[in-house]
Swiss-Prot record:
Species of provenance: Lychas mucronatus (Chinese swimming scorpion)
Modification after translation: Contains 3 disulfide bonds.
Cellular location(s): Secreted
Lineage: Eukaryota, Metazoa, Ecdysozoa, Arthropoda, Chelicerata
Name of the protein this chain belongs to: Venom protein 184
Coarse class of the protein's main subcellular location: secreted
Amino acid sequence: MKTTLIFCILGIVIPTAVVSSQDFCGLSQQEREDYWECVERGMSADELNQAKLFLECINKQSAVELLAFFCNADSIEDSIEKEEFRLLFAECLKSHPASFNAGNESCLKEARK
């Protein structure tokens, strides 16, 4: 009975700790909120640099969001800004390919260029 209870507790605590470490990536709540705001409205060059720390610790949820943003990057009017995002996205894709497995394949091919 005690053994079952211990395994049950471990089963709850360990996955939660793993997910938390991926989600937080050492960033404060405000930094994470700022990052998501950047993704939602389009990123400036400065915002891309600020988001880089988060991108280095990407997880599947943020990968899916970033892929969707990349696929719709034509909405970014500034071509320099768009290219900076593409380069940063491609770097992130190379560093964490497994995170993007659920993504749109044609878009992934474009991102890898």
